Amino acid sequence: MVTDNGSNYVAAGRIVSETYKTINWSPCAAHCLNLILGDISKLEHVAKLAKKASKITKYVYNHVYVLACLRKGKDWTEIIRPGATRFATTFIALHSLYHHMHDLKALVTSKDFVDSRYAKDRIAKEVVAIILENQFWNDCSIIVKIVEPLMRLLRIVDGDLKPSMGYVYEGMHRARLGIKKMFKNKRILYKPYTKILKERWDRQLRQHIHSAAYWLNPAFQYDQATFCNKPEVMAGLLDVIDSKATCSKSKLLAETRLFRDRLESFGLDLAISNCKSTQPDEWW
């Protein structure tokens, strides 16, 4: 059972889960991810970056000539595209803007634009200055890389194409590792971002069911190069078995060992070769 993250829903979900042992409650992952993106957008340097990006976007879409010139480019995609949430839309625009960096630079330095009336007013000059500012694009690149795994996870949990429970833990784990790697494990640089993820994850989203679903997802379990072996993962699985199982817990534990070690039917070539291309519920 998944509910909104409001305190009344949280209380109701816990009561139902405690009363009916076979029902597991979890807060809405999409809502939590939206709050994470919102927290990141409130960081001072990110807010300044978004403000500059918004100035470019508004200028482009408020001038038909400028927009028409850009749309002539090969493989053009709109800068403004709807996202699953308000904050997602902001970062999608930032990503799209970064994708069109060369198009924008080429436009504002072209003779046609420089000689046109669209380049003469104060706002146009401010926009051109931002577009030609290398630091702006460097900052864009960093933020886009930070939020990319979060945006990917948001699309999974907010969509209806596949059950998402088995991907939440891995998505959050990958996001934290990616941020640390990008900043070359320099704590002073990555901490503002990982702190946001940790606080939201610990306070709102962390549930044993996420760890259990991650452990039972063959796409991750059978990828030993990236599989997370933190004690909390196994602890989550054991807690779910202990609190929710209605059959023999000993048999369940025995089967988890067969699954982990790829024994019996779990070791068949068909099972192994399809573990990443087949949804966990279908694979099982």
List the predicted regions and their residue ranges:
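Short alpha-helical patches at protein termini and domain edges
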Residues: 1-284
